[in-house]
Amino acid sequence: MSTTSSSGRIAADQNNKCVNSVAAALCPLSNCQFSGVVISAITDEQKLEFSNKYNSSCTLSCSYDSQGVLLRIMLDNDQGHVLKEYMISADTDAAQLGRRCYAISLESDNLVLRFVSDKDQQLFRKVVENVKHLRPKSVFSQRTEESSASQYFQFYGYLSQQQNMMQDYVRTSTYQRAILGNAIDFQDKVVLDVGAGSGILSFFAVQAGAAKVYAIEASNMAQYAQQLVESNNVQHKISVIPGKIEEIELPEKVDVIISEPMGYMLYNERMLETYLHARKWLKPHGKMYPTHGDLHIAPFSDESLYSEQYNKANFWYQSAFHGVDLTTLHKEGMKEYFRQPIVDTFDIRICMAKSVRHVCDFLNDKEDDLHVIDIPLEFHILQTGICHGLAFWFDVEFSGSSQNVWLSTSPTAPLTHWYQVRCLLPMPIFIKQGQTLTGRVLLEANRRQSYDVTIDLHIEGTLISSSNTLDLKNPYFRYTGAPVQAPPGTNTQSPSEQYWTQMDTQGNRNSNSMLNGTLSVNGMGDGSMDITHGLLHPH
């Protein structure tokens, strides 16, 4: 028997056990009845107006069904005649109203049920809540803690956060250029925008001639995206669908999927899995924008950064902090600081070797491939020094029919809101030019929408090695906006002499300008004023 079929059978058995356990939970509630229930219909949702649906109080009968709970409504004084039957399923919307009332949407009816006692209302509510457990968890829910998802969608529901991303002009302009520069891929096509946010990428697709765009957004930003769609009069082109791509249904397959699913170190937030999941709606030979991502990894040397983190941890080395000995927490403090990836930017000359490239193919890789990412490393060291850890950045490519466009977060490219990421070693290693540094980076996905990152490095031919495990969910945002400083020791000439030589050259240029009758303005060679008239014709 193959492993695949065995795994499938086990999964099916587990699902059956889950359904059976829910059925068992519902059994005590089977055939339960609630008498004296007054049923009202909501006649005006905006004004919250109600009217009695039946002339007298009713009896509700609940019985278990394979699809949920079958609800039968009968008059109290004529229980032999069923007025209406409804199926309470996992998708039924309901809410408690006070102690005795309960609002529920059943088929095309929006009802308010008023029970004779608190106990009856609580028991009926329990029936509905138990049915909810019949709904299989989506792929997203299975891999994500509820608290993490709530925080995540709340964060991206703020206009300020959308603005932060939209004002990353490298990001936004690159996407627009990639889409408009490949209009042939969008003209009269159906497009899916995954995690649409404000809907900016959907608008780009319409600008490129898309016939229809489905903009999927799970946060509250969906309502703002809808406002933008309506105010820009493109509601006939863009359809905003609130929800997760793992849980919603589309009316048709799509020709192109667009998204901005990249996080720090490419994989953080685990949005890439959602992007890959969306391929279930992609037609054969459809396009993905972006098409693939390259994670770059390089060893670096930065004594200043290492000392900064080390000295922070030394706070816990005080034996008399306001009369309290903190030293017992020094080891844990050190571990915590070095578990933080550093988010900032740097001069690429701190890198000690050419970066290793790990490719994620968005068209072909599977979601499961991103659960554990094991990247082998081999670096041929170009400069002698102390290796303090590994630096990470990524590039993504938009492979279009007309042109290929790259979005890069490299330290050699214009800065983006992704910056770069560095992972420190608590025990740095000294390595010489010409030696080979080997090892691995292991990214293990967790349910907090992030990864535990383990780095293991070893100098080939020696017993020297170092390792660390970091929490990508808890980075240290170090970027201050200050210009990036060149690494120490990169000057091959005297900076002082270079400066004075430059000033002397500028002084000679100004002197020559005066002799020629012109003087540069504010040191700018292209702006000048004529001084000969004043010299030859003084007032």
From Swiss-Prot:
Cited InterPro entries: Arg_MeTrfase, PH-like_dom_sf, PRMT_dom, SAM-dependent_MTases_sf
Modification comment: The dimethylated protein is the major form.
Catalytic reactions of this protein: L-arginyl-[protein] + 2 S-adenosyl-L-methionine = N(omega),N(omega)-dimethyl-L-arginyl-[protein] + 2 S-adenosyl-L-homocysteine + 2 H(+)
E.C. number: 2.1.1.319
Any Pfam family: PRMT_C
Single annotated GO MF: protein-arginine omega-N asymmetric methyltransferase activity
Gene3D superfamilies: Hnrnp arginine n-methyltransferase1, Pleckstrin-homology domain (PH domain)/Phosphotyrosine-binding domain (PTB), Vaccinia Virus protein VP39
Localisation: Cytoplasm; Nucleus
Keyword Oxidoreductase appears in the UniProt entry: no
Coiled coil: none
Coarse class of the protein's main subcellular location: cytoplasm
Residue ranges of domain SAM-dependent MTase PRMT-type in the record: 149-458
Sequence positions bearing Asymmetric dimethylarginine: R509
Keywords: Chromatin regulator, Cytoplasm, Methylation, Methyltransferase, Nucleus, S-adenosyl-L-methionine, Transcription, Transcription regulation, Transferase
GO cellular component, one term: histone methyltransferase complex
Keyword Cell cycle tagged: no
Complexes and interactors: Homodimer.
Similarity field: Belongs to the class I-like SAM-binding methyltransferase superfamily. Protein arginine N-methyltransferase family.
Protein name (Swiss-Prot/TrEMBL): Histone-arginine methyltransferase CARMER
Gene: Art4
